[in-house]
């Protein structure tokens, strides 16, 4: 009777064993085979390939040549795509740095300093604490007058007891509110101005308040803003474009004067060598020439002598 199942060497009947699964061969006279009355040939284990024989995955670049020195086909060598530096999937990192405020040096406009050189740079936060009963407006104005930097009001929290607001629909009039009002938002700015040589501050503030009954009032601050509880005001100081233009050092132009050309006289020519004077009374003594001709003397050994030419001298006879 033919069946589609395969009898495993262990004696059980199961489905087809996958090719990756291999079992060690058992002798044909095992008890299981004798019990089933079957005689199966021993199974041969496949020889491992060259890559599996090592048992470890090779690290590094793939091999370009086989063990016998023959080059591998191009299809067997995997192609490794080189990653382009500074780009991620076609996206330029430099453009992203410029978008979020990075410089080419890697620094970012941060809180508490940042990088100088751009308009609105050097942004520094400050926290102003206003005590109970003090005027918030005067504290902020006095803080802005401590230096040449411009300030902007970011936020504030606390409760006020008295506020004077300027309403746009009241034809330039003001309204004063008394009671306990919680600050919802406080914003504004103060910048340094110069008019006819005198420096001052220009700017203003606007506030939104919530009453105890839930009513919300707001407008431009036109007078007092008295604190009912300690209030924290967060402001930021920065340098404007006008101040930055004045702070830029001007480069001094240095003009190099042309060097004067001095005429150098040529060196004097050396005088002709002076001849030695021979004295007939003392032939072995020669009179030295003048002092200026000493440097032009030459060694007597270097001068060629003619042995055929002699000097005849007549000496007096005693």
From Swiss-Prot:
Transcription factor that specifically binds AT-rich DNA sequences related to the nuclear matrix attachment regions (MARs). This is AT-hook motif nuclear-localized protein 7. Residues 56-68 bind DNA. A motif (Bipartite nuclear localization signal) lies at residues 56-64. The PPC domain mediates interactions between AHL proteins. Residues 1-76, 241-318 are annotated as: Disordered. Keywords: DNA-binding, Nucleus, Transcription, Transcription regulation. It comes from the Eukaryota. Residues 288-312 have a biased composition (Polar residues). It comes from Arabidopsis thaliana (Mouse-ear cress). GO terms for cellular component: nucleus. Residues 264-274 have a biased composition (Pro residues). Residues 243-256 have a biased composition (Basic and acidic residues). CDD domains: DUF296. Residues 120-259 form the PPC domain. It is found in: Nucleus. One of its GO terms (molecular function) is minor groove of adenine-thymine-rich DNA binding.
